[in-house]
UniProtKB/Swiss-Prot annotation:
GO biological process per UniProt: queuosine biosynthetic process; tRNA wobble guanine modification
Family in the record: Belongs to the QueA family.
Subunit field text: Monomer.
Organism encoding this protein: Gluconobacter oxydans (strain 621H) (Gluconobacter suboxydans)
Compartments reported by the entry: Cytoplasm
Pathway: tRNA modification; tRNA-queuosine biosynthesis
Record-linked HAMAP family: QueA
Protein name in the entry: S-adenosylmethionine:tRNA ribosyltransferase-isomerase
Entry EC no(s): 2.4.99.17
Catalytic activities: 7-aminomethyl-7-carbaguanosine(34) in tRNA + S-adenosyl-L-methionine = epoxyqueuosine(34) in tRNA + adenine + L-methionine + 2 H(+)
Length: 347
């Protein structure tokens, strides 16, 4: 592919950006997108109609943490957004007013007894820090003093609300560690899951802790863009279910780009998947050959974003530009709290 960003750019009216989810969640629009056919609008609760008995649906079971923290170092105010936990137990974070931070600096969080020590100032607003507590004590600390790191396009002048605490969590949430919600999962309700079960569609989960980098557009060139690493895991049970589904001719249906990116990171050339644990920074763009995923359910993404490039790689750039033009013309709602599309993979 070329390094031209123009095919991945489009004008999105501001009033198309959803600031609240659909209620109920499964009443949001689901746009069925198939290469070579016009976009076909439905609603989320229709999802089972487009899947087949024996298909395997895979969702991300990460749970969002309260990743935004207000810290001080002496008189200086430092804003932190936790990005991902590192192998040594410290945290990578994006920091505002971080220029003067240096190793061994101690950060305080109001009157809370928990502190953090700066391990490294990486520059460009990135730091690694170690907290004075871990495990359940750390989780309790985040609940006391942290706030949800809502995407910047969900405007909350007074910060995230109690309603956001409920709205920005998926029905699959199990393992804490994500900065951002895997938003395709936000649409699922117990009723939708029951309908999938009734049709004989299997379900498994994986874990990818979504980092703050998911919000970043490509600002320079495609070739120069560097993806942020995110930690994920596919356990042996899920890997076996994928391989069994593939062997008997079923399709792998990824709920969200996070699930797809981890599946493709773990996939072998023949489309089978091994148990996997570690960090991935996979950047999927047109020209990529998909190995693991056949169908993708995902929300509508930002212009010039790596996620829009991913869906263009999956279903074809012209197909996705047509689908997004349809969505804009028909008032569909974009981004985290918005509507979704069900994408069939281009041949």
């Amino acid at each position: 592919m070329t390094d031209d960003l123009a095919p991945f750019d489009f004008e999105l009216p501001r009033d198309h950006i959803a600031t609240e989810p659909a209620r109920p969640r499964d009443s949001a629009t689901l746009l069925h997108v198939r290469p070579g056919l016009p976009p076909d609008p439905h609603v989320i609760r229709d999802l089972p109609d487009f899947l087949r008995e024996g298909d395997l649906l895979i969702a991300n079971n990460t749970a969002v943490i309260r990743a935004q923290l207000a810290a001080t170092r002496g008189e200086a105010k430092i804003g932190l957004t936790l990005d991902r936990i590192l192998a040594n137990g410290s945290w990578h974070a994006l920091a505002r007013n971080s220029r003067k931070l240096k190793p061994q600096d101690i950060l305080h969080f109001g009157d809370d007894p928990v502190t953090a020590t700066v391990i490294e100032n990486e520059g460009d607003g990135a730091v690694s820090i170690r907290f004075s507590v871990e495990g359940d004590e750390f989780d309790a600390f985040l609940e006391r003093v942290g706030a949800l790191a809502l995407p910047p396009y969900i405007e909350r002048p007074f910060g995230p609300t109690k309603q956001d605490d409920a709205d920005y969590r998926t029905i699959f949430s199990q393992y804490r560690g994500a900065v951002a919600a895997p938003t395709a999962g936000l649409h699922f309700t117990p009723e939708v899951l029951a309908a999938l079960d009734a049709k004989g569609i299997q379900r498994r989960t994986l874990t990818l802790h979504v980092g703050a980098g998911t919000f970043l557009p490509v600002r320079s060139t495609i070739a120069e863009h560097k993806m942020h690493a995110e930690w994920g895991e596919i356990d042996a049970e899920t890997a076996a279910a994928i391989n069994e589904t593939r062997a008997r001719g079923g399709r792998i249906v990824a709920v969200g780009t996070t699930s797809l990116r981890l599946l493709e990171s773990a996939a072998r050339e023949d489309g089978t998947v091994a148990p996997w644990r570690g960090e991935t920074s996979i950047f999927i763009k047109p020209g990529y050959r998909f190995k693991a995923v056949d169908v993708l359910m995902t929300n509508f993404h930002l212009p010039r974003s790596t996620l829009f490039m991913l869906v263009c790689a999956f279903s074809g750039t012209e197909t996705m530009r047509e689908a997004y033009a349809y969505a804009i013309a028909n008032g569909l709602r974009f981004y985290s709290y918005g509507d979704a599309c069900l994408l069939e993979r281009a041949p």
